[in-house]
């Protein structure tokens, strides 16, 4: 456990963020390895099929992850206030609420999968392969949910090392499973999906056993599973749904944009898949410091230490801006090599378009860095509405661009989409946070 309410914020934020960074890097490394394995051993059609459905699976998975992170903000506030009974109850309630959401998403996703894929304009020659892959991912959502709840709760009490170790085990098993099921057993993209779900199942078991043995304060009882604390339930639903929908709105916009991308041909689908995989690594620190600040702000809000919150937000913003500069240098020096490394493709159209995406979008990363820090900090401070408004603007912007710029300009319209919406969505965030008590008061407590 790590108490983020005491000590130097500059050191605490970095030491707390480092394991999250390594965990996210491991996850993205697996994603890149998975892409390379599918592309190398199954070919461009299989890679395009997976790429055409990645946004859909991300939409669902990111909703669950965002929701669990929202639940964990309440846990962080309980931990910061040193209220261990409510901390334990928050974990029990998180499991119950999350399970209900996962079951609904699983059933809905499987029932409406075919209409959704057709809405996404997945090419007919890729439809069967895409269906096989995403069906397994959706069927494993309950497993994903349990992992998200446990890892988010551990981070809420300051333990970012255990989720890192568990994820490392999961990634190794996942890559090994890919090679076994795809290369040896010839299961195709179905093997890639099965390997993902099985590795997550093992991660859940390991994480649950460790949590039970290590942290007595988190050993939930039957009463902790009952949704009987109206105040906690209201706060958890508000925080969880806000962060879940915040993630979903972003992905709905991206999903709509993907429908236009899928009309541009197989090479563009592959190029965009590669560019997004690489940009996810480039943006990794935005997510890392965003998660860090949600927990940091939550704990310090619970402890009523508002000055530490102000300083922490400024420090995290500075750290991410340094990272942005490194991304720009990387995109302009070895961007094309990274595209080849991810896809294994030597097709000029793939290399050119993916590299162009990286070179243009990285120039505007400073804007999205501020967005991620401010949005997650506001969630940790209990502000739910404005982050949702900001995410809604992103969704609307991408939908409008998908309907206008992409038909007019093709893939360059896709490349321009995110920088445009970033400038739009940062406005309400900056207006709101500068008016919040965090910038005006010396002390603040949870209401």
Please name every model-derived segment.
Residues 29-48, 117-124, 180-187, 248-277, ...:
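Helix-terminus/linker motif at the lipid-water interface of multi-pass membrane proteins
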Residues 15-34, 136, 170, 199-203, ...:
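Transmembrane helical elements of multi-pass membrane transporters/channels
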Residues 4-42, 55-70, 74, 99-106, ...:
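N-terminal transmembrane alpha-helices
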Residues 14, 18, 30, 67, ...:
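Residue-level signal for transmembrane alpha-helical positions in Major Facilitator Superfamily
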Residues 47-107, 144-163, 271-330, 335, ...:
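Small-residue-rich hydrophobic transmembrane alpha-helices
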Residues 68, 136-155, 163-174, 192-207, ...:
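Short runs within selected transmembrane alpha-helices of multi-pass transporters and secretion channels
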Residues 1-17, 75-140, 184-241, 297-364, ...:
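Short alpha-helical transmembrane segments in multi-pass integral membrane proteins
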Residues 20, 24, 36, 73, ...:
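Transmembrane alpha-helix boundary and packing residues in multipass membrane permease domains
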């Amino acid at each position: 456990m790590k108490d983020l309410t005491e000590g130097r914020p500059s050191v605490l934020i970095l030491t707390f963020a480092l394991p999250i960074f390594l965990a996210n890097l491991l996850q993205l490394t697996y994603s890149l390895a998975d892409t390379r394995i599918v592309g190398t051993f199954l070919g461009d059609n299989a890679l395009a099929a997976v790429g055409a459905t990645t946004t859909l699976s991300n939409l669902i998975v990111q909703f669950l992850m965002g929701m669990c992170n929202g639940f964990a903000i309440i846990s962080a506030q309980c931990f910061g206030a040193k209220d261990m009974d409510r901390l334990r109850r928050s974990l029990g309630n998180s499991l119950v609420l999350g399970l209900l959401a996962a079951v609904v998403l699983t059933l809905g996703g499987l029932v409406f999968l075919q209409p959704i894929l057709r809405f996404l304009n997945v090419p007919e020659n890729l439809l069967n392969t895409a269906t096989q892959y995403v069906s397994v991912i959706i069927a494993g959502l309950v497993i994903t949910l349990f992992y998200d709840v446990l890892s988010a709760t551990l981070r809420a009490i300051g333990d970012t090392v255990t989720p890192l170790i568990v994820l490392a085990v999961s990634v190794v098993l996942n890559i090994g499973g890919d090679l076994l099921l795809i290369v040896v057993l010839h299961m195709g993209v179905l093997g890639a999906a099965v390997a993902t779900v099985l590795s997550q199942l093992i991660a859940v078991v390991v994480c649950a056993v460790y949590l039970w043995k290590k942290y007595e304060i988190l050993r939930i009882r039957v009463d902790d599973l009952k949704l009987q604390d109206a105040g906690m339930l209201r706060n958890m639903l508000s925080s969880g749904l806000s962060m879940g929908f915040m993630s979903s709105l972003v992905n709905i916009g991206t999903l709509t944009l993907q429908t236009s991308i899928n009309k541009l041909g197989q090479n563009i689908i592959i190029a965009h898949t590669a560019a997004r995989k690489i940009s996810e690594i480039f943006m990794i620190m935005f997510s890392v410091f965003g998660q860090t600040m949600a927990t940091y702000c939550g704990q310090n809000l619970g402890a009523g230490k508002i000055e530490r919150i102000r300083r922490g937000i400024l420090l995290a913003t500075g750290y991410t801006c340094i990272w942005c500069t490194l991304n720009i240098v990387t995109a302009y020096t070895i961007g094309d090599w990274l595209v080849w490394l991810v896809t294994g493709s030597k097709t000029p159209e793939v290399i050119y378009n993916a590299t162009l995406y990286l070179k243009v979008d990285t120039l505007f990363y400073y804007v999205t860095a501020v967005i991620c820090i401010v949005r997650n900090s506001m969630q940790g401070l209990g502000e739910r509405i404005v982050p949702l408004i900001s995410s809604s603007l992103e969704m609307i912007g991408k939908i409008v661009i998908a309907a206008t710029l992409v038909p007019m300009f093709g893939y360059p319209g896709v490349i321009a989409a995110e920088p445009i919406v970033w400038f739009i969505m940062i406005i309400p965030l900056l207006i709101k946070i500068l008016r919040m008590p965090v910038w005006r008061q010396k002390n603040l407590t949870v209401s």
